[in-house]
């Protein structure tokens, strides 16, 4: 069984919990996921099954989109509402101040990963150090906020934001920084990933739906999966003749092929996806 299963991750599950559950449902250990989600977060988690797992590191679109809730009045050690409160302060700002500062967070910037993260220093994840009460210096990393928008206030001192950003962005840190720019203490009280690359909430299935499909048979389960070719939809398509197909399977370079320089997704004459090909015309 091969394909990409877009899972709607439930809250209080780690991304690895989802993989472990799917290994039981699908009966295979050959699974990989793209973009770890914190346990409190929900939403889009692409899982690559079988041979499709080779495509995890080949994705072309690494942008992510989120819907997050900023809660003013307190700051926690984890940057979200699951953590221990470190500071509290009266809330003296609101919607106006939020709207004033949001434009300043759009664009390329440097962001320091939080201690409660999977980033490794000297081979050890930061979150393990944080649990021992150890804090170490972390290097800021380049990120980009492509879009950020205020969506409303679900409760007093809470503000819902939608964010589209580059890979590696920590929304918890972003919300803390937004609160600080407002002159407030703040933390993230909810987070949902609404898209990961090409994949959106509309593509996602709950674990219950996946299990129900499995009980109906492999055909129903495979119907939930997206083809591995979907990862490369933005690449131009190249349809090759049988002799070229055989060359590609054998790992042989093929000369004199009528296509411009570049990277292509390749199908055979029957429409079967074969893989990727790089064409370079020597001068």
Indicate where each model-derived feature is located.
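Accessory RNA 3′-end/elbow-binding domains used by RNA modification enzymes
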Residues: 1-10, 16-33, 37, 41, ...
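Glycine/acidic-rich beta-strand-loop module
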Residues: 30-60, 128
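Pseudouridine synthase
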Residues: 118, 125, 157-201
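Helix-hairpin-helix/helix-loop-helix acidic hairpins
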Residues: 142-159
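Residue-level signal for inorganic ion chemistry
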Residues: 47, 68, 123, 174, ...
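Extended alpha-helical targeting/anchoring segments
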Residues: 117, 121-147
């Amino acid at each position: 069984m091969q394909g990409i299963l877009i899972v709607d991750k439930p809250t209080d599950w780690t991304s690895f919990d989802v993989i472990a559950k799917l290994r039981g449902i699908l009966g295979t250990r050959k699974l990989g996921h793209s973009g770890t989600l914190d346990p409190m977060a929900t939403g889009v988690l692409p899982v690559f099954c079988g041979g499709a797992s080779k495509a995890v590191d080949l994705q072309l679109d690494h942008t992510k989109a989120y819907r997050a809730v900023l809660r003013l009045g307190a700051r926690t050690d984890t940057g979200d509402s699951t953590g221990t409160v470190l500071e509290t302060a009266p809330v003296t700002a609101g919607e106006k101040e939020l709207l004033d500062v949001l434009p300043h967070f759009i664009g390329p910037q440097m962001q320091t990963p939080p201690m409660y993260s999977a980033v490794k220093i000297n081979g050890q994840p930061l979150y393990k150090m944080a649990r021992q009460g150890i804090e170490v210096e972390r290097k800021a990393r380049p990120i980009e906020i492509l879009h950020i928008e205020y969506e409303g206030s679900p409760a007093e001192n809470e503000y819902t934001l939608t964010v589209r950003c580059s890979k590696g962005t920590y929304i918890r840190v972003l919300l803390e920084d937004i609160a600080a720019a407002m002159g407030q203490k703040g933390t993230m009280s909810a987070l949902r990933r609404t898209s990961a690359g090409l994949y959106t909430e509309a593509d996602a299935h709950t674990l219950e739906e996946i299990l129900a499909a499995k009980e109906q048979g492999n055909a129903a389960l495979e119907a939930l999966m997206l083809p591995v070719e979907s990862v490369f939809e933005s690449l131009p398509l190249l349809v090759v003749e049988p002799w070229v197909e055989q060359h590609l399977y054998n790992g042989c370079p093929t000369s004199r092929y009528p296509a411009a320089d570049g990277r292509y997704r390749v199908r055979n004459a029957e429409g079967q996806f074969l893989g990727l090909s790089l064409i370079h015309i020597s001068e």
